[in-house]
Amino acid sequence: MSKQKIQLSDHFDYSRLIRFVLPCIGTMLFTSIYGIVDGLCVSNFVGKTAFAAVNLIMPVPMLVGTVGFMLGTGGSAIVGFTLGEGDKARADRYFSLFMSTALIAGIVLSVLGMLLLRPVALMLGAEGEMLDYALRYGRVLMLSLPTFILQNMFQSFFVTAEKPLLGFWFTVGAGCTNMVLDVLLVGILHWSVEGAAIATMLSQVVGGLLPVFYFLNRKNTSLLHLCRTQFEGGVLLKACVNGSSELMTNLSMSLVNILYNYQLLRFAGEDGVAAYGVIMYASFLFVAVFVGYAVGSAPIVSYHYGANNRKEVNNLYRKSLKLIGVVAVVMTIGSMFIIPHVARFFVGYDENLLILITRAFRLYGLSFLIMGFNVYASSFFTALGDGVTSALISFLRTLLFQVAAVLLLPLLLGIDGIWLAVTAAELAALLVSIGLFITRDQQFHYRKAE
């Protein structure tokens, strides 16, 4: 049984569900790990100022790259629904449309990003040596935006194509490329922040461009193939609306990261930005589990909803909430013990910074108890084709509540208010998610098996 191929049309018990989503979780975890290696190399081989500069400018290309998540999640829901209806040719046509759109958008945004990078860096508060490092790093990443957007998009479509493990191996290839080149270019050849950026750029070629050739091959054994397509504005608009929650999530994360850095520069200076960078790298590992599960399980929900199998949608809904609850408790407890050791890898050369990071993370890490439910709620409604509800959760959770918390809590609690802001925002979003789970069931009927 363990070697039997798992298909979207299957009934999912806990074992089958976990095995199906594990490659997607692994993909997200590995992506986080090679991002961490980036930070480790810059911090230890170039220095604290360069590390702070990279973390200051990093949200900018990440913000622009969210287009890939929007087309990936919104488009895969449409493609999965179409496959559930049994129309393979139309699913391929839609898939090809979304891929072409992602590539064109990446080229346009790359040009705009290069033109606007310096004024944006100045607006973020970069100056002197930090500004120089930020621009040198950011310019290279702006060049690689087309492949970065494709890489983000394919994360969802590999699952819909019933090839989550292949998607994982593409990510492993990209990650190994990044890590090896980080050590070579930054640690051995001393190419400074440009070396780290070039390593990231070439890894995105592996993760974003090579899958194009796989899906172009008519002999590939997945459910999806790239083919001739045509512009269908209605379908593209629906994908954008449906994926707007993921766009909002990732867009908001970048905007909020920018706001965090701005506040921390005011309250703690360069050390605050460096501390936040370490916390972000560490939290990537925990957030990756929730995001990987949400992305991995969404195509199953889309397929069964498209096939009008409400009983299986209910089964997936119930099992997912239970799994997320157990994992959230385990990860939160575990994170409190490992953070001092993680921090030492990054900034072992600065004892005061180590103390700041350890205290800050123990406040920030409380959010892991709640976060998974909100991530899943947004993804679940996207999978059902309810992009408006999904976008509402994402907008409130990742933008409105976090902006309010990071601006208001420091007035009451000082710098501790900044570290507690994400937990407060997740708690407020959880109340919204619970309310929407209850009210939207009247339309989708996922809380009771039919």
Predicted stretch roles:
Residues 1-21, 79-146, 188-244, 301-367, ...:
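Short alpha-helical transmembrane segments in multi-pass integral membrane proteins
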Residues 9-46, 59-74, 78, 103-110, ...:
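N-terminal transmembrane alpha-helices
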Residues 19-38, 140, 174, 203-207, ...:
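Transmembrane helical elements of multi-pass membrane transporters/channels
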Residues 24, 28, 40, 44, ...:
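Transmembrane alpha-helix boundary and packing residues in multipass membrane permease domains
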Residues 33-52, 121-128, 184-191, 251-281, ...:
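Helix-terminus/linker motif at the lipid-water interface of multi-pass membrane proteins
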Residues 42-62, 129-133, 193-194, 235-242, ...:
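Interfacial/gating helices of multi-pass transporter permease domains
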Residues 51-111, 148-167, 275-339, 371-393:
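Small-residue-rich hydrophobic transmembrane alpha-helices
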Residues 72, 140-159, 167-178, 196-211, ...:
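Short runs within selected transmembrane alpha-helices of multi-pass transporters and secretion channels
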